[in-house]
Amino acid sequence: MIVYSDIKRQFVNDVKDNSIADKILDAIKMRGLNAGHEKEYSSWQNSMQFMRNIVDDSEIDDEVRICIEYNIPLTSKRVDFIIAGADNVGKENIVIVELKQWQKAEVVADDMHYCVKTFVANTDRIVCHPSYQAYSYSCFLKNYSQSLTDESINLVPCAYLHNYQPEYRQTLSNPIYKEWFEVAPFFIKNEVAIFSDFVKKYITKKSSKGDLLYLIDHGRLRPTKALQDSLASMVIGNKEFMLLDEQAVCFDMCI
């Protein structure tokens, strides 16, 4: 389910005139979703300023699509931020951005490959590594959206921790998480230019296929051939299926 969706130019204007958080909240209420509490509202006010800085770039077409708080089908999970369009050669891409306001994090244990410890909701908590979170969301969408397969749309997961202090970067880049940050890179406070270049590698033009987000949201929802192959692989003992958020945390703590 799409919550907020508009072209880049309008998103930039919504942030500039300080109406973005209200628009997201109104859209969530209209759709009857259980979200929009005070801390979440504040996070929209904060994080959208940083994302505006990334997309408000002359190399990114004004009509590229922006989506905020996309509710993943069949789950209660939401993708923080999506940029949808095409690259310089016309290849359709959707960049999935997991946003975090963390300032630092810690490795929980050397055998816990999904999780880190950080200060969230007024206490230290064990949560998913942001790269894993972004990657798992992209896998779930890819496995269940037939439109992505039919239209050859590429998903590009990543994470942006715009408050994260550089001296703690080595925690998130610890080799135990390499499997995740190699497929879903993360960017921190002092890596604005690097993150901007990453986005522009995949998104500079509007899609020739129209609104990719609408296409996915209203497309066929069924297990794709890739998911069927993954399930078959699980039967013979290979771990294929992606765990989401709390599932991954529980798996790490129990194994």
Language-model features, listed with the residues they occupy:
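Accessory nucleic-acid engagement/destabilization modules that flank
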Residues: 1-214
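Compositionally biased, low-complexity repeat tracts
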Residues: 215, 233-236
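Active-site-adjacent bridging/hinge elements
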Residues: 108-114, 220-232
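Short, structured interface segments
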Residues: 212-222
